[in-house]
Amino acid sequence: MTVESLIQQDETFQNPDYFQVHNLFTVRDLFDARVHFGHKMGSLNENMKPFIFGHRFDTVIFDLDKTAFHLRQALNFLAHVAYRNGIILFVTRSPSSMLMVEKMAIEIGEYAHTRNWETAILTNSAVS
């Protein structure tokens, strides 16, 4: 049996939003949560430019329509992983969010790595 035939048999793959992640939030919710506020213009990574709406007072303003689209794609992917009992690893290096991330991972029975690690070790296997 091929992967393609398994996908065709699985009803969760037939509907692009089987888990209804589009109902979890609106663009207005993101705005109210101040998700659109980024960092200072001087620290802007070139790869982020397609997702920038503009800037105000030297602060990057993210395009919330693009943010919502990609967040929904990520949530849909995670829903598929969780539905199939896959492993989800929560990762942060931010001291202000370490405890919250660890607590949430434990609460839902998943894993977290919140301490320092060698740069690129999780994203570039050629380096490690």
Protein language model annotation of sequence segments:
Residues 1-128:
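Acidic-enriched and Gly/Ser
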